[in-house]
A protein has these predicted regions:
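All-alpha RGS (Regulator of G-protein Signaling) helical domain and cognate RGS-like helical scaffolds
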Residues: 41-240
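A short, ordered amphipathic alpha-helix with a cationic face
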Residues: 16-18, 171-172
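A periodicity- and composition-biased signal for non-globular, repetitive helical segments
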Residues: 9, 24-25, 30, 69, ...
Length: 240
């Protein structure tokens, strides 16, 4: 074969080979992108789906009881004040519950309760959206047995200093009950559901910080510096 022809043929083969490699790479990238997109926009894969559904229902109901607990502390207010800073302002009332006068006498506790109420309303809506978009589930918040028991105690606790202390201890316990499931969420949810991962990470941080804020209040204001929150699971509470 003439050398010029041989060189030309070789170049054509090299170009063809490179195009084939690039084409296969692009196909592979497309398949990965499609697979990733399907997982990100759809239900969890394998066992992650069951975990995600159970977790999202749990956190919706958990936060729902927190709304009422925080209302008892801060009070409800159907006519919100336009002022940014108003220590007497209450929260928006939860459907199904009557308007409530604030039982906490400490401005710091009422402020914390208002903030928790607003944050957890948003987190309930986000969890409902995950359930609806990924699993076609419409879940309305419900009070768990644990939540009902806590509300019964807070309802019967006299307003003022006694309520302040009871609320701080009980709301700390309530926060703690969301920590372990949310830590599990970080390693059991579908790895393509980055939005849920960030959601669970944020709950871990905010609940943990909230617990320690309340422990500091108990220590500073009521000399209860040895308080340890509990989940109600005696085995875990005694050993961990």
């Amino acid at each position: 074969m003439d050398r010029t022809v041989w060189d030309s043929t070789r170049r054509v083969e090299q170009v063809s080979t490179r195009r084939s490699v690039v084409s296969r790479a692009l196909v592979g990238m497309t398949l990965v992108a499609v697979a990733g997109g399907a997982a990100a926009d759809g239900p969890g894969r394998g066992s992650t789906a069951t975990f995600e559904r159970n977790y999202l229902v749990f956190i919706i109901d958990h936060h729902y009881s927190a709304l009422r607990m925080s209302e008892l502390a801060a009070g409800t207010d159907t006519q919100r004040d336009a002022a940014v800073s108003n220590p007497t302002e209450g929260t928006a009332p939860t459907p199904g519950f009557a308007a409530t006068v604030a039982k906490a006498s400490d401005d710091q506790i009422r402020s914390m309760a208002r903030q928790a109420n607003r944050t957890q309303r948003e987190e309930i809506m986000k969890a409902q959206r995950f359930l609806r978009d990924w699993y076609g589930v419409q879940h309305e918040p419900q009070l768990s047995a644990e939540g009902r028991n806590m509300l019964t105690v807070l309802d019967s606790t006299p307003a003022g200093s006694q309520f302040n202390q009871t609320f701080l201890r009980m709301f700390s316990n309530h926060h703690l009950s969301a920590l372990a499931p949310s830590v599990h969420c970080q390693v059991k949810s579908d790895i393509a559901h980055n939005g849920l991962l960030r959601y669970c990470e944020n709950i871990v941080v905010t609940q943990k910080n909230g617990i320690n804020d309340m422990r500091e209040m108990l220590c500073k204001n009521y000399s209860d510096c040895g308080f340890v929150p509990a989940t109600g699971d005696r085995r875990k509470d005694l050993f961990f």
